[in-house]
Amino acid sequence: IQEDHLGLNDIHDLNDLARVKSVIVKSVKKDGWAVLNAEDKHCVEIAKELNCNIAYFSMNEHCDVIVNHCRKGGIAAIYENGFITIKKGDWKMRVEKATHIPLTLGGKAKFMIANVLAATLASYLWGFKTEDIKAPLETFIPSAAQTPGRMNIFNFKNFKVMIDFAHNPAGYLGIEDFLQSVDATNKIGIIAGVGDRRDSDIIECAAIAARMFNHIVIRQEKHLRGRTEEEIIGLIM
């Protein structure tokens, strides 16, 4: 649960956003499962209000929530020694190496690894066998065909183009972390602001962009979501 959509429809802070998102897991049947991020304090608090089974995922296998949960026999998905791993109590089952999963872009896109952990855990809880989980992980490609606008990378002779619809600070930070692992002479960003986000969010996205790119081109979309182009560009600048 990260800062996005704040300032919209009476959602003013992360506590408000957490209450809205909790509606989904609070609707799960008693014999069903809620898959929650063990590293997010809001998710951990939400877990206390649920009447269903709970499973956690984390990039850190030593996370206190994971350790305590599994000590009680709970089920979790962890990123362990480069592997997507299911953990139940003291028992571990490695599902796949992250570098073998295209969505992780060679294991460099950490936020994608976290997404894979959640999806793998949900699949395991649903009853899928390990091989039936591995197959789609190995064949689901971040591309215009399968994930349009999400980490789409196009290879040209002397350069690469990556397209991603990151539009909040958390998304920009994820891209920044990934780009730090990319060896490139120049990193040129074409960015835009999202008009229905708070001033502070647009300004923070611009600051992150300034850190991760050598050159920046500002290009606004036609749908400005309630602001003028000049206003958005002013906040970015």
What are these regions (language model features)?
Residues 34-38, 188-191, 214-221:
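Short internal beta-strands
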Residues 75-101:
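Acidic-glycine-rich active-site phosphate/pyrophosphate-binding loop
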Residues 1-56, 61-63, 169:
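Flexible active-site lid/hinge loop adjacent to a nucleotide/diphosphate
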Residues 94-215:
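Nucleotide phosphate-binding/pyrophosphate-handling subdomain across enzymes
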Residues 205-237:
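C-terminal helical cap/extension that packs against the catalytic core
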Residues 51-80, 136-140, 152:
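Beta-strand->loop->alpha-helix junctions that form or flank phosphate-binding loops
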Residues 23-32, 52-53, 176-183, 189, ...:
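P-loop/Walker A phosphate-binding loop and immediately adjacent motor/lid segment at beta-alpha junctions
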Residues 1, 59, 192-194, 221:
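Cofactor-binding loop segments of dinucleotide-utilizing enzymes, especially the Rossmann-like FAD-
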